[in-house]
Amino acid sequence: MEDILFVYENQLPDNFSENVEKAGITPKVLTLSDELNFDKIDAVAYFGENKDNLKTVVEKAVESGVKRAVYVASAICYFNRRNTGQNLEKHPFVKNQTDCENAILAFSDKISVSVAEIPLAYPVPKEIFTIGGVPALKFRNFYLTFDGGYPEISDESAAESVLSVILNGKNGVIYPLCDKNAKFKAMLNEKYPDVKVYEFPEELWWVLALMAKSSLKKAGLTAKTNIKTLYKKDLYENYFFDDTEVRKALGYK
């Protein structure tokens, strides 16, 4: 098999290397030179370096004769495409992921490039009311959450789907990947089967979110997450996707 440049920022599942070797791909570990800067601490400055570092790596790969590149990006790029017009300067992580994705796709006229977008494995930010990583409120005999959720992917599916992009992905094509769209109520029911879970109206959640923001402000703190991301339209209607066609295109179930 030809050499493939494989770049990722998000953590890959433990069984990824095993699946890669089963497919007959032998990974080569490369050490990046000192010219790549990974010493930034400030989020905006640090993320700004990622795009430049990625471009440098791809340029060197092209110079060395590599014909294929696969970049593992975040599903948050997919959501950003669904919600155009956002000021990404206020969202450095989203901007970083989007800039990196666009940077490697810009090489599609020189090298075959495919992008795999997988859901984040990070929990909901701590400043949001959560139970077991799910936005919810805890009462004595029940939990309250709202009609929202986000896409999930298992370690096995992440390995299989990313490997499918490596083997079958087309040049210049982005592949959003997931197992299912998990609703918050279903997550809580699965984690806490002995506790009743109810969904409350989005208007009530909005009021609670504003109260949380006000409490943070009084404490001299600022919410790292835009308060609007707590709204149903953002977390439910816009943050689910169907990857049925992607699975067909890549040839995996």
Pin down the residues of each PLM region.
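NAD(P)-dependent short-chain dehydrogenase/reductase
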Residues: S112-S157
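Active-site beta-alpha turn of Rossmann-fold NAD(P)-dependent dehydrogenases/reductases
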Residues: G48, V70-S74, E117-P119, C178
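Residue-level signal for the nucleotide or nucleotide-sugar donor/cofactor binding architecture
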Residues: K95, Y150-I153, F241
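N-terminal Rossmann/SDR dinucleotide-binding element
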Residues: M1-A43, D52
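Amphipathic terminal alpha-helices
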Residues: E2, S17-V20, F38, Y236-K253
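Catalytic helix-loop patch of NAD(P)-dependent Rossmann-fold dehydrogenases
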Residues: N80-Y122, F142
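Conserved Rossmann-fold NAD(P)-dependent oxidoreductase catalytic core, especially the SDR/UDP-sugar
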Residues: A43, T56-K95, S114
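Mid/C-terminal beta-alpha module of Rossmann-like enzyme folds, strongest
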Residues: S161-K224, D243, K248
